[in-house]
Amino acid sequence: MDDSDTLEFSDILASTMHDTKNSLGMLYNTLDTLIGQCQEKGCPVQQDHFLLQYELRRLNHNFIRMLSLYKAKKANFPISLDYHSVSDCLDEAIVVNEPLLTSKGIDIELQCPADLFWSFDKELIMGILDSMLNNAYLYTKDKLMVSARREDGYLVVQLEDNGPGYPDYFLMDSRRKSGSAGSHVSFLTGSTGLGLYFSVLVAKSHTRDGREGFIRTMNGGIYNGSVFCLHLP
């Protein structure tokens, strides 16, 4: 076998992750069906089913992030820009996660102008929103605000909760190369760090007139908890 017939280990690993991600998707859909049946019968282990659903989604998000990072390293990070209704996209992301969040008594509120449209890669942005909403299941107390607005030529999508807030080392502004607490985050350790790194990568891939998208994390907001901000030019 010559070198041209030899697959790199990273390619084999990426292919395996892709197959595993698809299997997780099938498991998630099956569990979703079981949850619906359990709900109709007043199943006493319904909350356990929701917890399993949360973990499956978390694993699936990690595989999606790793595959995206692999494609980025191969200089093949896919971007497909089109104009979308921001309100419809946010509502779609909430609907997908609402059963999981409401099972824990989390109240979700959406604030977005109906006439707000923007150009972005819907699949990638929905991946960020889905991941952040899924994380809220674990970190918020019982409130979550999802909002969007125009600000200084950017689309700003913001998620706020009434949880304990981000630890100091997790506060960041991805426009800064150094000198911020966020610069000390080890993105490759822990699912939360990987999720943030993926979000930064997706944001930066959206460019317009020499400007890049960026991510900010802070504490405060209307609930005095954590605030995640996605800025797209």
Task: Show where each model-derived region lies.
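Short alpha-helical segment of the dimerization/phosphotransfer core of two-component systems
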Residues: 54-62
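Conserved micro-motifs of the catalytic ATP-binding
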Residues: 74-79, 117-120
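A conserved beta-strand-to-alpha-helix junction within the catalytic ATP-binding
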Residues: 82-94
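Conserved catalytic submotifs in the C-terminal HATPase_c
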Residues: 82-83, 107-116
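Short beta-strand/loop element within the Bergerat-fold HATPase_c
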Residues: 143-153
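Acidic ATP/Mg2+-coordinating residue in the GHKL
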Residues: 161
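Short conserved segment of the HATPase_c
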Residues: 166-182
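Glycine-rich ATP-binding loops of the HATPase_c
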Residues: 204-221
